[in-house]
Swiss-Prot record:
Endpoints of the signal sequence: none
Native source organism of the sequence: Bacillus subtilis (strain 168)
Family, similarity comment: Belongs to the binding-protein-dependent transport system permease family. HisMQ subfamily.
A biological-process GO annotation: amino acid transport
Keyword presence, Transmembrane helix: yes
Subcellular location per the Swiss-Prot or TrEMBL entry: Cell membrane
The protein's name: Probable amino-acid ABC transporter permease protein YckA
One GO term describing the cellular component: plasma membrane
GO function terms (MF aspect): transmembrane transporter activity
Stretches assigned to the ABC transmembrane type-1 domain: 27-215
Alphabetic keyword roster: Amino-acid transport, Cell membrane, Membrane, Transmembrane, Transmembrane helix, Transport
Superkingdom as given in the UniProt entry: Bacteria
InterPro entries assigned: AA_ABC_transptr_permease_3TM, ArtM/GltK/GlnP/TcyL/YhdX-like, MetI-like, MetI-like_sf
Topology of the protein relative to the lipid bilayer: Multi-pass membrane protein
Amino acid sequence: MINSIQWEYIFNTKLAIESFPYVIKGIGYTLLISFVSMFAGTVIGLFISLARMSKLALLRWPAKLYISFMRGVPILVILFILYFGFPYIGIEFSAVTAALIGFSLNSAAYIAEINRSAISSVEKGQWEAASSLGLSYWQTMRGIILPQSIRIALPPLANVLLDLIKASSLAAMITVPELLQHAKIIGGREFDYMTMYILTALIYWAICSIAAVFQNILEKKYAHYV
């Protein structure tokens, strides 16, 4: 049975090799979306997590609502709203801009919860000690709590980046010329989507594997300081 399978219809090695240089051109947009969204999401997520932990209901409840909405709505729907929906109200984004905004806002919700969990896991005695020294809330947060929470938050934050790298393929649905979009073009021209999708999967796997190596390096580095 296995011997009768025509493997060239599943993965055409020649086509994969020949099309690789073209497909890899999309890696720039894949990395741009992933890393810029991660950076923006981290900044936004930090403020949202602090608002989420605030004693002021005026800050806490909007943060809760934001997190609930972004975690409950598929990122593809958010991309469609930004790219296809906003023009109806006179606001137009390029495909890349819509992708950056969508992924940044979405990842911020997950990062906010990661930050909140990491900050909450720091012993309460640290807060009490800082208070006895006369440190303000922000001085305590900046100088004592956040540095300790980094190591706790690092593994799940790295997973968010890996998820962003993989999810960036959804940007192809709004015509961003990233990896998957390039692969789809070749697949349609050569009538061989299977080969191109497998090739794309291998490229994503390679990118995520490299990112995982750096994740391990960072975790070991911060383990010495916390």
